[in-house]
């Protein structure tokens, strides 16, 4: 069960930074490391956590400068730095390998992790992903409304977000942490050299759909899943579908 933001207080020091983290589940299960979307903290995984714990031991963490994690005065807010931070956190927690999965903004960190630390991966998950700077967002609200309407028509409801999922300790640091995509190049083509299995998934009503399909097509070991009635931020639109895709991927790979 996910602790509230107020009660979640585990801290690990890695790369000289104090990181807020949570490690849940049975030690015998394969590790799934989840990388947050933009503007949220690790408690926002609550809608899918219980379902995912049936298959995985789950590591969550707040990237530097967000949630309850500290940051470096040198302002090292880059996806490569976030990836190195995750690798260091795994080392301190004695987690040699993980299935690293990022959603939306977090998928950029997951992609960099794969490029820099493939030896620490059992698999890679890229949900709602685009790796181009910047992302075209003009249609995001229209597409989101379409997804909500479709869900309403079939009697499904989106998750009602908790305010605490967006809590963070320092507004200026969080802003810097969540604008790294404006400064980094597209790494899509580099993913084609990966040897590990890669799961790419995106909603039909997500502005990143075409980018996600392009990324999946560029990866020899890539598998693409299309999520119907789903906008950007798929765990909040259809958490059960999101969890089933991730859990089924484990079964297919026999992780």
Residue spans of the language-model regions?
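Flexible "cap/lid" loop of the alpha/beta hydrolase fold
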Residues: 108-116, 121-152
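Conserved alpha/beta-hydrolase "nucleophile elbow" surrounding the catalytic nucleophile
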Residues: 38, 98, 102-107
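Short beta-strand/loop motif that positions the catalytic acidic residue
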Residues: 194, 200-202
